[in-house]
């Protein structure tokens, strides 16, 4: 802890050396010394002026102040300050720090982060004809609020984690109590607690560190930008990983059949959605096995084809310098 105001200011100044956006404002109070610390553009200047600085200047006598910031400041998000590292982390997160010196030094952390991101808009990757036109944004608080607006139950829970020793990115694990599979939930908690990455900038970074098989060809987590799709997966018993700063939400566990599903399926009738998914799966099997079937019939079992059909194929391939296998391989690689 800090002995006096000078040691506090010097300690914070040394941490934020060569940081021109670090602001330390000293206030002239009756009976006390006070400072307000912020990081420019991270904290809301109007909120700090109205809810922090103005009430402090309006108080006539500070000599009897003993740390009751809630009775002075007009803010509902006030926490007690800790050591220098905790205060520095709070400042970087957009909070304001108030220090008042009377009989001893009292420190408070006020949540005053300023949001500078885009508003809710249409998704850019998963465009649908029917259904909601809103998508997730880069603000984790807005994303959680939008999910709560759809899944209106107190059983919707989430656990916050801080990942990245340098970035300290907030990641939330969301699930519905009673619906989510407990083994999946415990496995996700264990993965998030066991990893110690240096930098987390996007949900793609979270996907990499939570991948069970590092060299596996199939993904272990899904990704969606659509709010109603994420809500439907929550109700179906899935878990969500929401990363602050990313408009894409990770879903787990991810099964192979989800690759043939669309966000629009969740707003269609069950019969129609099942039929369309069956068509997608059939088209996948057709694209997978049709080249092999063509190679087998033409190269190894020409007697299974009608003679006139095989004659046409043979004449068309007479001037091609590569084999049918090489031709099909090139076609599959290119398309």
Predicted segments, located by residue:
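Membrane-embedded alpha-helical signal segments
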Residues: 1-289, 307
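Core alpha-helical transmembrane segments of integral membrane proteins
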Residues: 264, 270-335
